């Protein structure tokens, strides 16, 4: 979870709140397009998270987030192949200042264009873990295995080795065998 201030927690619990969204689209070529609440089609944005692709529990499933948004931006949709979208939520606190919370980085999977609107659908980097395991036998700590998987999938590991080792079984040796998959 992202750490927020006590003032943020109080503001989010209020009956009414003033907030806005901003974001940045970065193309594979490094071109950046900034957008704010004026560029977002009202009521078009969403972020949802789902664990499994169906109604059954699956071993190894992770929560993956989907983001959708419609923007009044004049961007060629074909330039958005392999682009990333960063979203930020700005909440007004009791003292009148705004606290910013990053809502994630999403990889564009669909970009559709109408005359005035660009519609984006994107997924977070957890989908990078949806790949075949190479089947070798391995023994290691939880952190070692997490670091191995994160590096192989190109995803930054959010926890430090010390944080993982502080967990109840964080320093235990674990085994993975090919026939488990």
Where are these regions (language model features)?
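Charged- and aromatic-enriched interaction segments used to assemble
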Residues: 112-181
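Assembly/oligomerization scaffold segments
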Residues: 1-137
């Amino acid at each position: 979870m992202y750490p927020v201030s006590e003032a943020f927690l109080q503001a989010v619990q209020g009956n009414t709140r003033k907030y806005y969204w901003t974001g940045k689209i970065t193309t594979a070529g490094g071109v950046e397009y900034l957008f704010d609440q004026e560029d977002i089609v009202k009521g078009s944005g969403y972020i949802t998270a789902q664990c499994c692709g169906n109604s059954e529990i699956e071993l190894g499933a992770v929560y993956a987030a989907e983001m959708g948004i419609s923007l009044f931006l004049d961007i060629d949709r074909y330039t958005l192949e392999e682009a990333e979208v960063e979203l930020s939520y700005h909440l007004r606190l009791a003292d009148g200042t705004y606290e910013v919370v990053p809502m994630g980085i999403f990889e564009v999977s669909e970009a559709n264009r109408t005359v005035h609107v660009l519609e984006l659908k994107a997924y977070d980097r957890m989908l990078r873990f949806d790949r075949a395991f190479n089947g070798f036998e391995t023994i290691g700590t939880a952190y070692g295995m997490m670091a191995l998987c994160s590096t192989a999938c190109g995803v930054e590991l959010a926890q430090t080795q010390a944080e993982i080792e502080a967990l109840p079984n964080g320093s235990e040796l674990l085994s993975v065998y090919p026939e488990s998959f």
